[in-house]
Amino acid sequence: MKKTMILLLTIWATITISAQDSLRIRLDSLLKDPMFETSQVGLMVYDLTADSVYYQHNARQLLRPASTMKLVTAITALDQLGSSYQFRTRLYHTGTISNGCLNGDIYCVGGFDPMVDMEDVKAFAHQLHALGVDTLRGRIVTDCTMKEDLDYGEGWCWDDDNPRLKPLMIGRQDIFVDALVEEMMNDSIFIEQVQVTNGRCPADATLVATRSHTIDQVLIPMMKQSDNYYAEALFYQIAASTGRRPAKASDGRHVVKKLISHIGLGSQPYKIADGSGLSLYNYLSAELETMLLRYAWLHGTIYDHLYPALPVAGYDGTLEKRMTQGPAEGNVRAKTGTLTGISSLAGYCEAENGHQLCFSIINQGVMRNADGKAFQDRFCQVLCGEKEEVKGVKEVKEVKRSARSAQKRRGRRR
């Protein structure tokens, strides 16, 4: 009997595969998909609980991230601007108000708030009326000097559906002044002669009203719906935080690169072009995205605002119809990315053992985005604990059962 036990234990020790090794084998098997004969993938999984790299493949390869670039923008913004940051649009006037007549100009100062709507415009008109203004004898001036005069980002495709990068818009339309004039008239404010021009608001102008939206309000549609306009607006807030006016995209890139250096990856030749991922000039790695996710997780002031904004697998945002079953459903929270030939996914999940993980998967050269998404979904299901026998695991179970049976028989003989 003793010899039998030794033999069983020897066999067991020879073919035992730990749960982690089993998982790694399954992840390895996913990389044998025929799609990788004509495409490539870079990926990394980091065990946040154990604080170590769990799995990686081509993790440092430079790839186009598509909209997972928004993760880089969001994390940088929360780190640089703070979680209480607000987007602001302001209305000023010059001159004096006498007998209900404003003898001066109105200045509309755009702060590139992507959430400005008609309610904000109505509030501006109401506040003018509340000041006793019933007549405007002057100009309406738009101040868009917070950013450089570029309507589109670097490396954007000319035939794509790109948002215009104007700091004073309503619902992506350049209609702010028209809307303000209409609301002023609705509030019985007579404009002697509508004169509209562009210019910089004087430092001594009088503030009429400020309308604002929080960074959390902007992050939700930016991340869950992958809104490019919101992402670029946030990118220019990062740029403006440097104190430069007009803020330039290059200022935003500089801040992002400072954070990359701070997390220890500054020596890598990454290319940062925009904040949304629309640009074909962006080149990042799965390692960079994963390490930024780790950085966010380590800093509650970032993570507590980033995590709720991420799409939830099977529930909302761009992941609403993905991973609708299995252990990844409701578990994976991640940002998606899609451009022609590019499919990406990066975010957080919980493993079967309760460990918190962050990951990045960047598929490149996939002519059918559905293939990239299918691979990512399968990868996440396995990562979250989807069950499937792996060669050797069944034999381990049989050995364990045999060993337990032998122990029971031995106990009975005593």
Regions from the PLM with identified roles:
Residues M1-S22, R414:
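Bacterial Sec-dependent N-terminal signal peptides
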Residues A19-T49, V53-L62, H126-G132:
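Beta-lactamase-like hydrolase cores
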Residues T38-Q40, N58-R60, A66-M69, S84-Q86, ...:
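Extracytoplasmic
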Residues G42-Y46, Y54-Q56, D105-V109, R139-D143, ...:
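Soluble periplasmic/extracytoplasmic beta-strand elements of cell-envelope proteins
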Residues D51, P65-S83, I140, A179-E183, ...:
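Active-site SXXK
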Residues T89-G95, C101-M184, H213-V255, L284:
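Active-site-adjacent helix/loop patches that line small-molecule binding or acyl-intermediate pockets
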Residues D174-Y307:
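A small/polar active-site loop signature that marks catalytic segments
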Residues K271-D274, L278-R414:
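C-terminal soluble interaction/assembly domains
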